[in-house]
Amino acid sequence: MSGGKYVDSEGHLYTVPIREQGNIYKPNNKAMAEEINEKQVYDAHTKEIDLVNRDPKHLNDDVVKIDFEDVIAEPEGTHSFDGIWKASFTTFTVTKYWFYRLLSALFGIPMALIWGIYFAILSFLHIWAVVPCIKSFLIEIQCVSRVYSIYVHTFCDPFFEAVGKIFSSIRINMQKEI
């Protein structure tokens, strides 16, 4: 495993590890690779995505897991009819499910495009502007830090050492008078 390349037990070369269940682009990748019996190189841009666990890093565990019981609750002694309660539950759940799907269908790809552009710009600026500026600043500040260090060792160290010696001879006696 070197340079981001993965070689399996049969000598197949991959840029990312291949899972048993495959990915969205080529289902059952490993089985297909074994059937074809040739070296295939997979790009990180078409990396495998999990269609079952879509939040593997648990980014939204505490934010968007909102169920009917989290929003609507009837305390003891104040209950609606059972049919109304069941219909409300079904209406809430189905509406939330399909409206999310509708919003995802309408705005998912444009939002992915916007966030992709945003993070591309952010990465570009970090790589080509922020890090070079910080490195340049650190190189230039070394000169200032040497002058500052000489100043501190020449003037501040002796001054504070003298003040420390002056205050080190102070003795405090506390007596309690009855």
UniProtKB/Swiss-Prot annotation:
Belongs to the caveolin family. GO terms for cellular component: acrosomal membrane; caveola; caveolar macromolecular signaling complex; cell cortex; cilium; endoplasmic reticulum; endosome; focal adhesion. Residues 149-160 are annotated as: Interacts with SPRY1, SPRY2, and SPRY4. A lipid is attached at residues 133, 143, 156 (S-palmitoyl cysteine). The lineage of its organism: Eukaryota, Metazoa, Chordata, Craniata, Vertebrata. The gene is CAV1. Residues 2-94 are annotated as: Required for homooligomerization. May act as a scaffolding protein within caveolar membranes. Forms a stable heterooligomeric complex with CAV2 that targets to lipid rafts and drives caveolae formation. Mediates the recruitment of CAVIN proteins (CAVIN1/2/3/4) to the caveolae. Interacts directly with G-protein alpha subunits and can functionally regulate their activity. Involved in the costimulatory signal essential for T-cell receptor (TCR)-mediated T-cell activation. Its binding to DPP4 induces T-cell proliferation and NF-kappa-B activation in a T-cell receptor/CD3-dependent manner. It comes from Mustela putorius furo (European domestic ferret). Residues 105-125 dip into the membrane without crossing it. The modification Phosphoserine is found at residues 2, 9. One of its GO terms (molecular function) is inward rectifier potassium channel inhibitor activity. The modification Phosphotyrosine is found at residues 6, 14, 25. The modification N6-acetyllysine is found at residue 5. PROSITE patterns: CAVEOLIN. The modification N-acetylserine is found at residue 2. Homooligomer. Interacts with GLIPR2. Interacts with NOSTRIN. Interacts with SNAP25 and STX1A. Interacts (via the N-terminus) with DPP4; the interaction is direct. Interacts with CTNNB1, CDH1 and JUP. Interacts with PACSIN2; this interaction induces membrane tubulation. Interacts with SLC7A9. Interacts with BMX and BTK. Interacts with TGFBR1. Interacts with CAVIN3 (via leucine-zipper domain) in a cholesterol-sensitive manner. Interacts with CAVIN1. Interacts with EHD2 in a cholesterol-dependent manner. Its main location: Golgi. Residues 82-94 are annotated as: Interaction with CAVIN3. Phosphorylated at Tyr-14 by ABL1 in response to oxidative stress. PANTHER family: CAVEOLIN (PTHR10844), CAVEOLIN-1 (PTHR10844:SF18). Coiled coil: none annotated. Residues 131-142, 167-178 are annotated as: Interacts with SPRY1, SPRY2, SPRY3 and SPRY4. It is found in: Golgi apparatus membrane; Cell membrane; Membrane, Caveola; Membrane raft. This is Caveolin-1. InterPro entries: Caveolin, Caveolin_CS. Residues 2-104, 126-178 are cytoplasmic.
